[in-house]
């Protein structure tokens, strides 16, 4: 089994097992700050009514729902996730929302045509993908020329005080939550390790550029524990 496939299997197992507790776990771990961060990001996006959006690694569909409200009744939002169990939770939350379609799929091999979406988002999911660059290139492929990509993800704090608190939190507090909500030590250790292994905001910006995005805007939240990367797919050149 290749390293990428091994990571895929590990990620799939983790999220299959924590799906029913994921929303509560997310609220507790972030002290519900993920909701505040997402509201700020949505304001920065200025989503147009009637547009078409894709939420990659949509999980239980929180960001999918926010996008659904933004695009309105004449817009369309597709949520994609690798975990069937996470999608089942999302389907229950969105069953009365007619402009949402949830599908099972792989972020590194998106089942969509080129140039399909006005917006592509990924929230707290990129760190779980085996190859960040491959996933970003796939998101670029399915975006329409001039379309917007937005990633909201954990990051590495740069402020000394936040950096120290961040390390202590993940070393001592996070394991307690993990033991309460995860079924095994491996599951909560994955949640920790994937956060520590993820690139800082500047390195992630470089990956965005390598994937073909431009005009990249970075916004840090809560001392740098999370960051937004917002960029655009190059517009088609006119002859």
From Swiss-Prot:
GO biological process terms, semicolon-separated: menaquinone biosynthetic process; methylation
UniProt catalytic activity: a 2-demethylmenaquinol + S-adenosyl-L-methionine = a menaquinol + S-adenosyl-L-homocysteine + H(+)
Enzyme Commission number(s) of this protein: 2.1.1.163
Entry keywords, A to Z: Menaquinone biosynthesis, Methyltransferase, S-adenosyl-L-methionine, Transferase
Domain of life, source organism: Bacteria
Amino-acid positions noted as binding S-adenosyl-L-methionine in the UniProt annotation, renumbered to this chain: 60, 81, 106-107
PROSITE patterns: SAM_MT_UBIE, UBIE_1, UBIE_2
Similarity comment: Belongs to the class I-like SAM-binding methyltransferase superfamily. MenG/UbiE family.
NCBIfam families in UniProt: MenG_MenH_UbiE (TIGR01934), PRK00216.1-4 (NF001243), PRK00216.1-5 (NF001244)
Name of this protein: Demethylmenaquinone methyltransferase
Organism name: Staphylococcus haemolyticus (strain JCSC1435)
Phylogenetic placement of the source organism: Bacteria, Bacillati, Bacillota, Bacilli, Bacillales
């Amino acid at each position: 089994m290749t390293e990428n496939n091994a990571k895929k299997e590990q990620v799939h197992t983790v999220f299959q097992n924590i799906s029913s507790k994921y929303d509560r776990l997310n609220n507790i771990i972030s002290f519900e700050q993920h909701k505040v961060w997402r509201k700020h990001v949505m304001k920065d996006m200025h989503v147009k009514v009637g547009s078409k959006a894709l939420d990659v690694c949509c999980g239980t569909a929180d960001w999918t729902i926010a996008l659904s409200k933004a695009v309105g009744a004449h817009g369309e939002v597709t949520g994609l996730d690798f975990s069937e169990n996470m999608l089942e939770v999302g389907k229950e939350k969105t069953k009365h929302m007619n402009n949402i379609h949830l599908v099972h799929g792989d972020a590194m091999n998106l089942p969509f045509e080129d140039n399909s979406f006005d917006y592509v988002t990924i929230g707290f999911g990129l760190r779980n993908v085996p190859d960040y660059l491959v996933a970003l290139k796939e998101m670029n492929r399915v975006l329409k020329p001039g379309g917007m990509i937005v990633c909201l993800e954990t990051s590495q704090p740069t402020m000394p005080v936040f950096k120290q608190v961040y390390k202590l939190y993940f070393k001592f507090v996070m394991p307690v939550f993990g033991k309460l909500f995860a079924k095994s030590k491996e599951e909560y250790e994955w949640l920790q390790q994937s956060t520590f292994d993820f690139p800082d905001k500047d390195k992630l910006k470089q990956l965005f550029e390598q994937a073909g995005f431009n005009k990249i805007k970075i916004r840090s939240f809560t001392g740098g524990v999370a960051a937004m990367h917002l960029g655009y797919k190059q517009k088609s050149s006119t002859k």
